[in-house]
Every structure is written in structure tokens, then in C-alpha cells.
Amino acid sequence: MLQVGCGRPLIRPTAFEWNPALELKTAQIKEGTLLYAVAGEGPPVLLLHGFGGQIWVWEKQVVPLSRQYRLYIPDLLGNGYSDRPKVEYTPALFIDSIRQFMDLAGIKRASLIGNSMGGGIAWAFALRHPDRVEKLILIDSIPPDVVPEIRNPSFRWFFAIRNLALLPQLGVALHTRGMLRATLMEMVFDDRLITDQVVERQYQIGRIAGTAWVVTSTARHAEEVKHYAGALGTLARPTLIIWGEQDEVFPVSVGKTLHTLIKSSELLVIKGSGHMPMWEHPDETNRAILEFLGR
């Protein structure tokens, strides 16, 4: 999910309008401050959003999953209401930021659920720190060879220009609400879900100063996730791969490839869903998550 960007100062909310009761906290890792939400009691589960995403993409998981699990939902470094330091946003940075976050939160071992880029961070984290992962749930995750697999027009255009001086940052900074709406519609099968409220929520997050740098740097380093790909066949954590049948970003064939590469995995394809089935078809997705985690 691509953010927009300009220069609004970062002011962290004390509550979200979509769930005012959700507890928000901060964690100070060495690169900056992360905002995260916590809910429920039970075994720990981390939920990781995708490229340019934010805590809100998990809004439909909070209530059902928190009945049985302790949820930790961070805004990744550089995203949402977390700090945007001017560093290089490499896969290694995101992986280490999750390790730091778990250390600070006192989480020795957890199940990880990741969507899109968050899925890639999850499987790469599991390869780097297998002793800290219980189970993996990958929802329309990025594959090891991410850039050639991208299908939606907005991302293909952005990744095509990502290495040109200043142009990607300018493109992000000039992103309008209309352009953002078009990008969000590429994330779902049912365009009616992209309401004015959803657009405005994402638009305001993306206006925070430093966003253009974060998005551009993340895109420029995206292919470095291939460094972890060779070990995917050794991933021994139980893994559930969930895929939207109508995903316009990564087609179902990408999910099938991941399923083949990760020997300990199973694949569930959700009909009538795009790139974010946990948001577009939450009931079916939540049932699958709870059944898998409960084994």
C-alpha cells in the first residue's frame, strides 16, 4: 500500500477512531520510536503490515484474535505513526527492528502474521531468528524475487523509477487523494471498500514529513530480500499461506511458488479477495488464522 508524502509533523494519536479502546504504546529502538497497539491475553502474536501500510490494516483482526492471543501490532519503522529517521530502509533494518521490538516488549518467542512486505519480513525474520518464531502466517506475502512479480500499475510504475535521482520522492510527495484512491483500489477486489474515510486515513498518515524518503528507500532496497531466499527451503516453522484469488499485486502463482519453497507450509486461496484478504474477507481469514494457531 503506497503512502503519499509531504511535510506534516509527526503527532502520534492517543487513540484510533476505528477502535478507541485499543491500547497504544511506544517502543524506543536504536533507530527511533515505534508506535504499536496491544490487545488481549494469551500466547503472543505479532501482526506486520505491508509497504506503506499502518496498524489500521489489521483493524478487523483485533477483536476476534485478541480473545485468545496477546496481539502486538506495530507501525513498522518509517511507517504509520512511527519515526521516520533518514536511514536506508533495507530488509535487514526491518528484520532487526522487529528483533529489537520483541526484546523491548519482553517477547521471547511469538507467532508472526505478515501481509505483503510484512510477510516478507516475517519469513526472513524466521530464517534469521528461528528460535524466536512459533508459527508463520503469510498473507499475500512478497516473494524472494519481488520486483519482477509485481503486477499492479501503481507499484510497477514506482518500482520502475525507484533508482532515478529525486523523481520517486517527487512522485510520492505529489500523490493526490485521487491517485491514492486508485492505488488503494488495486489492493482490493471490491472497490466499494475504498471509502472516503479509508482514503483520508491513509492520506493523512502519508503526509507526515519523511514519508517520501522512506517509501523510496524501501523500494530501492526491495530486491535485497533475495539474500534470504536460498534458505527458504530450510524454513521449519509451521506456515500458513493465505492468498486473495484476485490479488492484482502478486498473482496466486506467487503464493503457490512460496508454498512449494516452504516445505512446512499449507496454502489457502480466498475467493473474491484482492491483496488484503484479512481486511476484505476478515471472517474467512480470521477463521483460518485461529484454526491454524490453535493446533
PLM regions: where:
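Conserved alpha/beta-hydrolase catalytic His-Asp/Glu region
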Residues: V147-I150, G171-T234
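Alpha/beta-hydrolase fold catalytic core
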Residues: M1-P44, R67-Y69, I107-K108, L293-R295
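Conserved HGGG/HGGXW glycine-rich cap/lid loop of the alpha/beta-hydrolase fold
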Residues: L35-Y81
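Active-site loop/oxyanion-hole signature of alpha/beta-hydrolase fold enzymes
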Residues: A37-A39, Y72-M117, E149, R287
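Short beta-strand/loop motif that positions the catalytic acidic residue
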Residues: L235, I241-W243
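Flexible "cap/lid" loop of the alpha/beta hydrolase fold
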Residues: L127, I137-Q169
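Catalytic active-site module of serine/aspartate enzymes centered on a nucleophile-bearing elbow/loop
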Residues: S265-R295
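Acidic catalytic loop of the alpha/beta-hydrolase fold
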Residues: Q246-F250
